Amino acid sequence: MAPTARTPTARTRDDRRATTRTARLRTRIPEPDEEPDLLGQYLTQIGATPLLTAEDEVRLATRIEAGVRAREELETADTGEPAPTPRRRRTLEETVHDGQEAKDHMVRANLRLVVSMAKRHAHRGLPLLDVIQEGNLGLIRAVEKFDHTKGFKFSTYATWWIRQAIERGLATHARTVRLPVHVVEQLQKLAKVERKLRAGLDREPTTEEVAAESGIDVDKVVWLRRVGRDAVSLDTPVDETGDTVVGDLIPDTEVLRAPEVAEFQALAAELREAVGTLAPRESLILSLRYGLHDGRPRTLQQVAQHVGLTRERVRQLEKESLAHLRAPENRERLLDWAS
């Protein structure tokens, strides 16, 4: 006996459920050995939907708009306006379902854009999967707001909404003490300036140097640094003897949490791909300089002694290597991880 064919309504319902499962990741924290499979399965799943052409985007957006108009007409009729005929109501309901199907399709086809942007923010206080979740919410909003008649490519339009959703999600959830979004943005600016000065000076910049470079007055820099502290150092003594520090009182969990494993794997993959484009000597210099192999950065002098070159030659090679990594094919990937 031949299998029963699914009705258009059933197909629409199944597609919508699939989109919901894809766009909204589960918040349960899996066991450590589950996480690579979960992330890999998600990436495989979202890759199953082909990317859209400009014509596809227009067609889907047109169907979405038709569905919105049909829904509004039904809601108006339900609030007391003259009711549509049964045939008209059936047509409107089918149009609503078709619009929802088109919306789900556009969301699924652009989930890879969210992952690409989420990787650039995953190291800023939220696990990678949580950042993807925030970005997916922005993507859904972009699909709802997209106006194809203005001639924009959807990915260009959606990027703004995804970035805003991720930034606000980080501002809301990434800190133990919640800070206003504008304060978080100032802290991010301050952190970038400090990294730039630290790299150029080869030492920690003073408050005055940070203020001058950032254009923020000294008192505001001091205040931002104070409110930006989100944790007590594990090396802080708990009494006057100094024999016991805060870290001694915290039990060792032995393993990283699963979302952290996924985040570190994503970053490690990006770094391996980028540094692998360098010559072996330059690759070693960057690995030592920034602690890529053991998490312990070295000074220029320490690197020079290790590789048998002068301090100035190491500085030159480091500068040349970083310039190579700032090339267009590498710049977006790595600078966004460092932002």
From Swiss-Prot:
Keywords: DNA-binding, Sigma factor, Transcription, Transcription regulation. Residues 1-37, 71-101 are annotated as: Disordered. A motif (Polymerase core binding) lies at residues 130-143. One of its GO terms (biological process) is DNA-templated transcription initiation. The keyword Transcription regulation applies. One of its GO terms (molecular function) is sigma factor activity. Residues 91-101 have a biased composition (Basic and acidic residues). InterPro entries: RNA_pol_sigma-70_dom, RNA_pol_sigma70, RNA_pol_sigma70_r1_2, RNA_pol_sigma70_r2, RNA_pol_sigma70_r3, RNA_pol_sigma70_r4, RNA_pol_sigma_r2, RNA_pol_sigma_r3/r4-like. Residues 1-10 have a biased composition (Low complexity). Belongs to the sigma-70 factor family. This is RNA polymerase principal sigma factor HrdC. The lineage of its organism: Bacteria, Bacillati, Actinomycetota, Actinomycetes, Kitasatosporales.
